[in-house]
Amino acid sequence: MSDNKERKSQGFPKEDNQDTSSLADAVEKVAKQQQSQASEIEKNKKVLFNLKNELHELEKEIAAISAETKETERQIYQQDSAIENTKLHCDSLETQIKSLHSENVKLKFDIETAQEDFEEHMIKYNAYYAKIKAHKNSLGEVESKWSFMTELHEKRDFVKKLKTMKEELMQDLQNPGGNRITQVQEDITNLKDKIITVKESIIEKTCFLEEEKKTHEKLRKEIEVQHKRYDAILKRLHCQVNKLQSNRRQWQWNIQQLEKTAAELRKCIGMQE
């Protein structure tokens, strides 16, 4: 029995050494786990700090983009006001153009009326000239059918008439104040006055028509220039508005993306905490 006790006493130190070794391993393992967890916590703290900084920067960017969006909306409102003013000005110009067109149509109608009157007078003159010519022809035909005696009597009467007229003319020539010379001079003077009046009227109307043509041509060119200029302004304004609207849509999309990113970052921060 004493031998057994000695053997048992010799076996206890080995078991104690094994327990001590396993305990030390466990302690070392726990220490390593704690160290690893502490290192992981430090990393997570750094990540959390960086995420908070990024979130702060994103909030700053969102605020800046929001301010820029408001400024863009203000510019769009100003552009809309400018477009509205331009439309009003174009409406005013169109009213003026319609008024000028009405005046032009009226003048054209007056010119056409004057042309029609002139043509009517020419038709009447041609008809009168044709009648005179026909009368002369018919008179010639009748005269060609007269007999010799009839022609002789008529020629004698005509010669007598010519002699009488010759005597009257001789008397009128000897008397400067004679009725026939005075009448002829008055007729000549009246004809000259009428010719001068007609010439002056023709010159005046011609000058007036030329001035009207020049005025109409000038107005037409000015209207074309104004139309081209305002068309260019409207096109430029439409391009600017389209560009601003495109930028606005892009900024809204960027804000949405930033808000999504911020929401994801907040979610990550909440999970880390």
Curated annotation (Swiss-Prot):
It comes from the Eukaryota. Residues 24-116, 179-269 form a coiled coil. Keywords: Coiled coil. Residues 1-17 have a biased composition (Basic and acidic residues). The keyword Coiled coil applies. Residues 1-39 are annotated as: Disordered. The keyword Cytoplasm does not apply. This is Coiled-coil domain-containing protein 122. It comes from Homo sapiens (Human). The lineage of its organism: Eukaryota, Metazoa, Chordata, Craniata, Vertebrata.
